[in-house]
Amino acid sequence: MGKSKKEKQQAYFFDNKALLALILPLVVEQLLAVLVGMADSIMIASVGEAAVSGVSLVDQIMVLLINAFSALATGGAVVAGQFLGQDRREEACKSATQMVWFITICAIGITVLVYLGKSFILHTVFGKIDQDVMHHADIYLLIVAASIPFMALYNGGAAIFRTMGNSKVTMQISIIMNVINIGGNAILIYGFHRGTEGVAIPTLVSRMTAAIIIIALLCDEKRTLHIERTWRYRINWEMVKKILSIGVPNGLENSMFQLGKIIVLSLVSTFGTYAIAANAVSNAIALFQILPGMAITLAITPVISRCVGAGDYEQAKYYNKKLMLITYVSMTAMVLFIFSLLPFILKAYNLSDLTAKTTADIIHFHGIGAIFIWPVAFSLPATFRAAGDAKACMYISSISMWIFRIGFSYVLGKYMGMGVFGIWVAMVIDWVFRAMCFVIRYFKGSWKKNAIV
């Protein structure tokens, strides 16, 4: 006798209600991050241009570190998720504990290196900058560097909660963190006139608070995944190697992506003030266009890793198809919504006619690319990583970025005279190449041969 429809639905790891409960808080979390980032920028601007520049320089390093910790956290999440798929809860908890300890030790080591190399970072990495900018960067780095271990702990903890299918907790902690950050900024900048310190201190306090809350919650043994309550940590190299097999390729991919953005930004600056402004505004608006996709991509890891752990690739394909469809629908809705608001958004920025026209062209072009290409170029590889196929993602993404995103930016933007618009065209060409490679790999089934537990 075949299974009834109800029995088949019960065999699925995530029903529609569970998927919705996983995705919606992630969308809210991503939206908060973008909105708070914008509010942060406005508050910092009130301190002065030198403060904006100094904070921005240090934040570029912080973004690199956040990417590295997120990659390690993803590695731990994939390992724990695959163990859960095999109903090996004890091993899943051990992998979560190993990831949290390992990521913390790495973060403490990086923090020590940042403090020891502070002078090198300020004078060599940042190059020749004005003394005023250097002063603000120095103050900000001195305070914010202390938040590195807490930032790592939060990233690790958030990944574990998502693996359990519980993104509501991370959303709630994110709200607390952002309230502390924005509230602290407002009080210290506008109330006590602390300048750059007023920006840095709330960042440190909010990250400390988030880390303490998430680790306290993870020590609850009633949870599906929890960490051991002990200060005696013994490294399990076999487990750590599994985590690193995902974390290292993913981290290198993220870091190179960030490096590519910096290289392209240096090219944009050669096109003049209007191009810099158009690019900055376009980046801010474009982030909203892909926001649902970024949230759903985070949801893919716990869902697919559970299926792969169980050896159920049919279910993995089912969820991949379902989540990709949700990504396409939600991104289409968001892009069309942004298109409808674009005239009002551009008016609010008070741009010159040339800058406004260039920005509108970029946003329309980016939006169309986001609807048709972005999900396959960025959400589909999340399925591969969850299946243990992180190296292939790294190779494809790195080759595509250097040849198309960076190489074609110079060809189209500089040599063919397309300016800043050419850089965005090059970016979408990069998406097309990635999408083609990932679709071919998906249908060939190569990604199914890399389960790590």
Labelled PLM ranges:
Residues 31, 35-53, 122-131, 187-194, ...:
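Helix-terminus/linker motif at the lipid-water interface of multi-pass membrane proteins
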Residues 21, 44-63, 131-136, 196-197, ...:
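Interfacial/gating helices of multi-pass transporter permease domains
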Residues 26, 30, 41-42, 78, ...:
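Transmembrane alpha-helix boundary and packing residues in multipass membrane permease domains
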Residues 11-42, 46-47, 63-75, 79, ...:
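N-terminal transmembrane alpha-helices
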Residues 1-25, 80-147, 180, 191-248, ...:
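Short alpha-helical transmembrane segments in multi-pass integral membrane proteins
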Residues 52-112, 151-170, 265, 276-342, ...:
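Small-residue-rich hydrophobic transmembrane alpha-helices
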Residues 73, 143-162, 170-181, 199-214, ...:
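Short runs within selected transmembrane alpha-helices of multi-pass transporters and secretion channels
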Residues 21-40, 143, 206-210, 214, ...:
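Transmembrane helical elements of multi-pass membrane transporters/channels
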